[in-house]
């Protein structure tokens, strides 16, 4: 249940980045535009997004690996000691992969939620930046995971309706 809530909060976080907010409506799995699946982790894999077609429109399957034990010793140890850190990793992975579902590419800016570690970087520091905003689990929903660039890219892809 907890991870499912984190995924719902990640969807809500993206929806709030547009004006008006994107509307997220649950629907049948077979026709859903975005589907989120929890899967066993591949070594070092946080998640992935795969595009697909549904009724002639682009859709996405998001796969999240919630087991932090396979994400390297530093991440695994910190997640064992700090449940909010573990949930931060899962939440930010959901946000990142959902970003791909909305059409955002990887970036090389460490401050972006769409940053890719292919450019290197400190994995723990990346997640701790968000974790440090949290005092309690419910704070995950309230703290923004986005850089200005993340928000700007989404607003570019989904411009305000009725404005040109």
Regions found by a protein language model. Give the residues of each.
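Metzincin-family zinc-dependent endopeptidase catalytic domain
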Residues: 3-110, 119-122
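A generic structural signal for solvent-exposed, polar alpha-helical segments
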Residues: 20, 44, 152, 163-164
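The catalytic-center signature of Zn2+-dependent metalloproteases
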Residues: 84-162
């Amino acid at each position: 249940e907890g991870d499912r809530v984190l995924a719902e909060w990640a969807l809500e976080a993206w929806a709030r980045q547009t004006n008006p907010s994107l509307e997220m409506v649950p629907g049948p799995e077979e026709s859903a535009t975005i589907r989120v699946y929890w899967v066993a982790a591949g070594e070092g894999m946080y998640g992935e997004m795969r595009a697909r077609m549904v009724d002639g429109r682009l859709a996405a399957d998001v796969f999240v690996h919630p087991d932090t034990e396979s994400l390297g010793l530093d991440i695994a140890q910190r997640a064992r000691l700090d449940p909010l850190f573990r949930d931060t990793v899962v939440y930010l992975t959901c946000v990142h992969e959902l970003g791909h579902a909305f059409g955002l590419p990887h970036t090389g800016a460490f401050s972006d939620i769409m940053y890719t570690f292919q450019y290197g970087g400190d994995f723990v520091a990346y997640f701790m930046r968000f974790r440090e905003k949290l005092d309690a689990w419910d704070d995950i929903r309230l703290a923004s995971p986005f850089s200005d660039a993340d928000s700007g890219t989404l607003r570019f892809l989904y411009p305000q309706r009725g404005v040109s």
